[in-house]
Amino acid sequence: MSARRRLLRWGSWFAVLNAALLAVVGLRYLWYYSALQPSLAWIYAILAFLGQMTVLGYTPFLLLVPVIVLVPRPRLVLPIGVVLASAVLSFMVLDSLVFAENRYHVGVLTFLLLAPLTWAFLALYFLVGVAIEAMLGLWVWKRSAVPPRRRIGRYLALGLGVCFVASHLAHAWAEAHSYVPVTAFTRYLPLYFPLKDSRRMAKLGLVDEARVREHRLVTALGRPPEGELNYPLAPLRCEPRRPMLNVLLVVVDAMRADVLGPSLAPRLTEFAQGAIRFDAHYSGGNASRAGMFSLFYGLPATYWDAFADLAQPPVLMDLFRRYDYQLGLFSSSPVYSWVVELDRTALARIPNLRRETISPVPGAAARDRILTDEWYDWLGRRDPSRPFFGFLFYNAAVAFEPPDDYPPAVPVPPGASEWVRRHSRYLTAVRFLDALVGRVLDDLARRKLDERTVIIVTSDHGMEFDENGQGFRGHGTAYSQLQMHTPLVIRWPGRPPGRVLRRTSHNDVAPTLLAELFGCTNPPSDYASGQSLFSDSQWEWLIGASHLDFALIEPERVTIVRPNGYEIRDREYRLVQNPQLPNAGLRAALAEMRRFYR
């Protein structure tokens, strides 16, 4: 047997065994696939899973083929094959862990956000992978010297190839027929790009042409719009109302709506009784970047890239600067972090921007305390003859980092899981921040500024701990009410307190300030997607966004649109098995996502 032929045989068997190894690691993906109910979904999931693991297992071998053909030397080929296979294996381990935690796969943004400790673990995974792959590769190399007696390898390769082809054909059929139990599985496999050919199936008479039109609509929604920004659509016509009020915006990162109560947030609950509380308020995203964008701009966060590329601030911040507001901007987490990047969007072009909170003591709680002290100091040094805009962005809740000596909000039973412990730390951090924000409000009253200041307390998004039993935890993982429903409490001098039950969103905050504070007479549609919070309107649909996808949120359902497909979930965030696309809402959303491009 020639060296080249033996190396090709070794590479093929090495790929098959690597596919089996990856399948063992990848079983974690199947664990979270909630739609495995109909038999067709079971069959497809198994075929797609085996086919994709085969593709990933064979990828190092395919990269090795040119080397084997040109330089058939075992001492060169085997080490390269082991390193490539180890890289794929360590990637799979990391991706499965990320997916289990966040329900999305590893991407460029994920690598940018990895902590140094995670990089250390990734290096450890790689070294362990090298050891495993080296032993596996040497064992296969020894076995490859024995001439094959049966054609097991050919039959095995044929079977895996059939799995690959059959799964892609099944997906093409399922997508054309909107069969969600099959199409929903796409997002569970890493680097999986199944066949999509609805148009050809329609030409062959295998599917309804109407289904193809629906598919085109979703495909259009999944593509980011292109073009130059046209923002605002018309020059602003504003005449501020004198004397001009101060504005204080307090954002508690990841504070969800249902924690605003006397047990966990007594100070803010007391504040809400003398203010306007919006009970059905939603963020524009399930992560900080999208939530903060919708809060400052009043636009869907699908525009984030376009504004960030130009460092284009919102008209709200332009007006604060135009009318000589003093800006007291204090964020616990760095404004330049990849998570939010406020320095490229809402706080862009601000001279001497305070970019981060520096604390000699590690931890979000320590930074939050320093942030508050620096706010007090700034407030005492400001020019009292000019109005101010204050922005306080607290971080302890989203980081699950209350002070070490702070009494826990709920007890943690012995042997509790990590997420049970996180839930306790989250609630404790909320209680800690409630007290901290309460002192900020007391300080305003002591300085006799509360009657001349619009005070807004809200959050950028919520937080989930698998209360729905769907396996979603944290934030940025789902468009459920737990991650989208946020508190909003506003005390506006001269307006009576009350509770608003109609649906509102972050998109409505900027239009409210422009109309009521700056006296802008433009229709809100000139610069935002929302309406004034003090109007009688409510949204019938809302565009929610995350880092990787977006959703059309309606009162009774959520349509999640991803680059590789879509899924529809009900109010309890359960997957809808045979959905009907909300065509009217999707077309309106598509128009809104393109309205501010030329």
Predicted segment positions?
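Transmembrane and membrane-interface helices of multi-pass
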Residues: 1-193
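Active-site rim elements
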Residues: 43, 47-49, 303-307, 361-363, ...
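Active-site-proximal alpha/beta segments of enzymes that process anionic O-linked groups
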Residues: 163-413
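Short beta-strand segments
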Residues: 251, 282, 329-331, 388-396, ...
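Substrate-binding rim/cap in mid-to-C-terminal beta-strand-loop elements of soluble/periplasmic
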Residues: 286-297, 472-526
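A solvent-exposed, charged loop/short amphipathic helix patch at secondary-structure junctions
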Residues: 406-427
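Histidine-centered active-site microenvironments of extracellular/periplasmic hydrolases
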Residues: 445, 449-494, 539
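Phosphate/adenylate-binding glycine loop and adjacent helical scaffold
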Residues: 527-598
